[in-house]
UniProtKB/Swiss-Prot annotation:
It comes from Coxiella burnetii (strain CbuK_Q154) (Coxiella burnetii (strain Q154)). The gene is thiC. Its EC number is 4.1.99.17. Catalyzes the synthesis of the hydroxymethylpyrimidine phosphate (HMP-P) moiety of thiamine from aminoimidazole ribotide (AIR) in a radical S-adenosyl-L-methionine (SAM)-dependent reaction. This is Phosphomethylpyrimidine synthase. Zn(2+) binds at H386, H450. Transmembrane segments: none annotated. Homodimer.
Length: 554
């Protein structure tokens, strides 16, 4: 006992040292600002404000939480400030969906609305022709300007959006997932039986927040699963998701046959008590669908899907996640945990895309959605996978139809199988396309996909690729807050304001590094050219001269 206590104290000390020395997130030319609520005036929504050299500023959606506020001290093991605790204490124990159906706007809903607008309502664009030309094609989506708390309430009530916020995760900053809002990006972290400590997982979490992860899934499969999850939850300002099946399997030492509903149920309750915001539940992998995967090139590639398929065959019984689904709903309702209905039969190769097994499970997901809604539980649906570009639209169309417009959450999809080491690029192409079609949450893919456990650089590259995909989709959809950053960066580029170009970029450090490889001196940051064209062939420089000439003759 003494040895275990000493070890725990040592881990707490290491985490405290890490948080003190490394856990401050900084962005160039930026400061943390807070926007006040109107319905709930005590609400303070954290945003990032970039200051530009010409006096302009840009307010951005910020996933970094208290880590980017130098005025907040983060202590371990207590973790982050318990932002939502006062709201939770003074109201009935209901889900966000239940409140929404009753017509009640919660503080979480107003908080999410303020984040979505990014102070866009304060900026007016007078070029009406440009606005009409670039207004975007939201397809069947309806995106108001501005986005109001009432609109968010209605979207949740209709099942078209979720606000994942377990009552036992008060540290989380409310956010909304749905096709009528900014496209969100999920990052996966977690240890394996071979790697990682508690401190390393917290470091991964903060690193993912730094690069814009809107949600994080803890997919730990090794030892200390519960301890790692507890520490992540206490230090996370974004919703945390898990696959409870992984911990349940650890409890039986990986013996699939020994897994029971009772073991899974207890695991579910334990994780809900800790504060997990959404669970991936592979309840759509049914006995009758398993033979449909026999002719596939890559079989069943979902870890949870393959485990439940094996369990069904070993026991010659139906999937207990399906047969006990209403009991799962009751547990999740008690804590306001959201469903992320797993796509256990998703295609793992282009050859298997859009096959019978995949869409059979999707139909069952739709049936389960309706049961979850009946119990007042929020739900989103997970999707593929490996899909060629020409088949992506069918996935989105069928999901909207089968699942009654519940949020879609996809892994990519990867648009080709030939890019090991570059799967983050191949999948970001598919992610941008399906997000424009209506996908609400994109699970990032890193360069290590199919090859190994990603390191910090892989996490960064995966998130950057997916933030680009999400933003491209927001532009295409015509989200009212999407284009501000593009316009300001383009103006800075045309006016040779190099520092503003760097600071407005998704990755300012890399942009500055690439520029400085050939023109490192400070004087080059004011030059009217870069090393690509030089001073004589810069099109922007020439364009300025053309404008000056036109002004003189007119």
């Amino acid at each position: 006992m003494r040895r275990e206590g000493t070890t725990r104290l040592h881990r707490t000390f290491l985490l405290r040292v890490y948080l003190k020395e490394s856990a401050v997130i900084t962005y160039p030319a930026s400061k943390k600002i807070y926007c006040q609520g109107k319905i709930f005036p005590t609400i303070r929504v954290g945003m990032r404000e970039i200051q530009l050299t010409n006096g302009d500023s840009l307010t951005l959606y910020d996933t970094s939480g208290p880590y980017s506020d130098p005025n907040i001290s983060i202590k371990s093991p207590q973790g982050l400030p318990r932002l939502r605790e006062p709201w939770i204490k003074v109201r009935p124990r209901k889900t966000q969906l239940a409140f929404a159906k009753e017509g009640v706007i919660t503080p979480e809903m107003e908080y999410a609305a303020i984040r979505e607008n990014q102070k866009r309502e304060l900026k007016k664009n007078t070029d009406q022709e440009r606005e009409r030309r670039l207004q975007g094609n939201s397809l069947s989506a309806r995106i108001p300007n501005p986005i109001t708390p009432e609109f968010i309430r209605n979207e949740i009530a209709c099942g078209r959006a979720i606000l994942p916020a377990n009552i036992n995760h008060p540290e989380s900053e409310p956010m909304i997932i749905g096709r009528h809002f900014l496209v969100k990006v999920n990052a996966n972290i977690g240890n394996s039986s071979l790697t990682s400590s508690v401190e390393e997982e917290v470091e991964k979490l903060i690193w993912a927040l730094r690069w814009g992860a809107d949600t994080v899934m803890d997919l730990s499969t090794g030892k200390k699963i519960k301890e790692i999850r507890e520490t992540i939850l206490r230090h996370s300002p974004v919703p945390i998701g898990t696959v409870p099946l992984y911990e349940a399997l650890e409890k039986v030492d990986g013996d699939v046959k020994a897994l029971t509903w009772e073991i899974f149920r207890d695991t579910l309750i334990s994780q809900a008590e800790q504060g997990v915001d959404y669970f991936t539940i592979h309840a759509g992998v049914l006995n009758r669908f398993i033979p449909l995967t026999q002719k596939r090139v890559t079989g069943i590639v979902s870890r949870g899907g393959s485990l439940m398929a094996k369990w069904c065959l070993l026991h010659r019984e139906e999937n207990f996640l399906y047969t006990h689904f209403t009991e799962i709903c009751e547990i999740m309702r008690a804590y306001d945990v959201s469903f992320s209905l797993g796509d256990g039969l998703r295609p793992g190769s282009i050859a298997d895309a859009n096959d019978e097994a995949q869409f059979a499970e999707l139909k069952i997901q739709g049936e389960l959605n309706r049961i979850a809604w009946k119990y007042g539980v929020q739900v989103m649906n997970e999707g593929p996978g490996h899909i060629p570009l020409n088949l992506i639209e069918e996935n989105m169309t069928k999901q909207l139809a089968y699942c009654r417009e519940a949020p879609f959450y996809t892994l990519g999809p990867l648009t080709t199988d030939i890019a090991p080491g570059y799967d983050h690029i191949g999948s970001a192409i598919g992610a941008a396309f399906i997000a424009w079609q209506g996908c609400a949450l994109l699970c990032y893919v890193t360069p290590k996909e199919h090859l190994g456990l990603p390191n910090k650089q892989d996490v960064k590259e995966g998130l950057i690729a997916y933030k680009i995909a999400a933003h491209a989709a927001d532009l295409a959809k015509g989200h009212p807050a999407a284009r501000q950053r593009d316009d300001l960066l383009s103006q800075a580029r045309f006016e040779f304001r190099w520092h503003d170009q760097f600071n407005l970029a998704l990755d300012a450090e890399t942009a500055r590094l690439f520029h400085d490889e050939t023109l490192p001196k400070e004087a080059a940051k004011h030059a009217h050219f870069c090393s690509l064209c030089g001073p004589k062939f810069c099109a922007y420089k020439t364009s300025h001269e053309v404008r000056d000439t036109l002004q003189k003759v007119t």
